[in-house]
């Protein structure tokens, strides 16, 4: 938490109530094996909020097959950097041991590493859903961050990010 530069209110990261008329861009990192619910749940919720959010889907390839076998297309290439004020959502995958061992996951992990400086500078916010926290941990994004994940991968999260403050049963 910090104070908003415009209104002085305490805010998480970069968003504040003074920017209610702003459209916030939300970027969903979309990899092969993405959990359908982890992607569509947050996306649908934000879509229902109206024009306050612009949803973008990014990843190493333009089309992936998700956990339900459905093909998701229209995925944009990974941008060099996220614009200031963005929200990055890293959804989980159906089997992180398999899905995060792919060339696409390696490319996404490298891209996430390149975003670390901007994340530390709080120019964008990071939200991980379920095992998406493991990918962020592998990219070094969770050092000194209070975090949790699905109980099946919490041990791997703690191993991938020993400096993260991983918590169980949250």
Segments from the language model and where they lie:
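Extended, subdomain-level signal for the structured scaffold at the beginning of enzyme domains
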Residues: 4-126, 135-138, 165
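A short beta-strand/loop micro-motif in the catalytic core of glycosyltransferases
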Residues: 126-127, 147
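Low-complexity basic/metal-binding stretches
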Residues: 1-4, 169
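A conserved active-site-flanking secondary-structure segment within enzyme catalytic domains
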Residues: 142-170
């Amino acid at each position: 938490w910090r104070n908003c530069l415009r209104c002085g209110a305490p805010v998480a990261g970069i968003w504040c109530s003074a920017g209610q008329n702003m459209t916030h861009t939300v970027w969903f990192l979309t990899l092969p094996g993405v959990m359908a619910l982890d992607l569509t749940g947050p996306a649908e919720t934000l879509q229902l909020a109206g024009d306050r959010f612009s949803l973008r889907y990014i990843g190493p390839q333009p089309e992936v097959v998700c956990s339900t076998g459905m093909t998701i297309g229209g995925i944009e290439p990974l941008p060099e950097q996220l614009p200031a004020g963005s929200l990055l959502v890293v959804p989980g995958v159906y089997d992180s041991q398999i899905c995060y061992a792919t060339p696409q996951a390696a490319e996404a992990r490298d891209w996430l590493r390149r975003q670390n400086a901007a994340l530390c500078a709080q120019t964008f916010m990071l939200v991980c859903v379920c095992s998406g926290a493991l990918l962020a941990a592998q990219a070094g994004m969770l050092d000194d961050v209070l975090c949790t994940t699905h109980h099946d991968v919490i041990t791997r999260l703690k191993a991938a990010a020993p400096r993260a403050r991983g918590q169980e049963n949250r």
